[in-house]
Amino acid sequence: MYTLYIIRCSDNSLYTGIAKNLEKRLVVHKNGRGSVYVRARLPFSLVYTEKHKDRSHATKREMEIKKMTRQKKETLIRN
């Protein structure tokens, strides 16, 4: 099982990623060892998650979300 996640960074930007172990991945981000993008924008908050049965489906959905406009991402997060 993979989790797609969106986090809101300190500058109010949104970062989308996937993880097999979400809790572990969030700790990595918080410790500044995750993506360079998030590292430069700490602290952050988790605002959205989706579960996917495998990496392939999670990656496909991640790419769909990354192509969305900011407004569509905000709507997804609210709903």
Functional labels for PLM-detected ranges:
Residues 1-52, 56-66, 70-79:
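GIY-YIG nuclease catalytic motif and its immediate N-terminal context
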